Amino acid sequence: MSLLLLLLACGLTCLGQVAQKFAVESWRGQPSSALQKLRSGWLWLALFSLGLGLLVWLLVLQRMEVGVAYPMLSLNFVFITLIAHFVFREHIDRRHWFGVALVIGGVLLLSRHA
């Protein structure tokens, strides 16, 4: 249950980051006021998902040691890298992929402790 909550917290925070990216991309090249930017559905999705992610994270901290749970949030690095590559078509070099593999290895080691 704790690992599922941790994955949910990761998913929600990643969704928030991706929604922020979509929000700023939608503003690019458009002269818009702060009020117009506040009307962005992407911005509100980002705020909602990050807020909900925080609440889920608090549940995680009630169930897991912070020394184990927090490093496992590095899964966000993996998820965001995949989204950057496949959704935003960003180039990811070999060193970056190697870093992703190391993060996955570290999370697997930590998950045995959880």
UniProtKB/Swiss-Prot annotation:
A Pfam match: EamA
Cell compartment(s), UniProt: Cell inner membrane
Keywords in alphabetical order: Cell inner membrane, Cell membrane, Lipid A biosynthesis, Lipid biosynthesis, Lipid metabolism, Lipopolysaccharide biosynthesis, Membrane, Transmembrane, Transmembrane helix, Transport
Annotated transmembrane regions: 41-61, 68-88
GO molecular function (one): carbohydrate derivative transmembrane transporter activity
Coiled coil: none
Membrane topology: Multi-pass membrane protein
Cellular compartments per GO CC: plasma membrane
Record-level GO BP terms: lipid A biosynthetic process; lipopolysaccharide biosynthetic process
Residues covered by the EamA domain: 43-112
Metabolic or biological pathway, per its Swiss-Prot or TrEMBL entry: Bacterial outer membrane biogenesis; lipopolysaccharide biosynthesis
Cysteines joined through disulfide linkages: none
Gene3D superfamilies for this protein: 1.10.3730.20
Free-text function comment from the UniProt entry: Translocates 4-amino-4-deoxy-L-arabinose-phosphoundecaprenol (alpha-L-Ara4N-phosphoundecaprenol) from the cytoplasmic to the periplasmic side of the inner membrane.
HAMAP family according to UniProt: Flippase_ArnE (MF_01869)
PANTHER family assigned to the protein according to its UniProt record, in alphabetical order: 4-AMINO-4-DEOXY-L-ARABINOSE-PHOSPHOUNDECAPRENOL FLIPPASE SUBUNIT ARNE-RELATED, SMR FAMILY PROTON-DEPENDENT DRUG EFFLUX TRANSPORTER SUGE
Subunit structure: Heterodimer of ArnE and ArnF.
Protein name, entry field: Probable 4-amino-4-deoxy-L-arabinose-phosphoundecaprenol flippase subunit ArnE
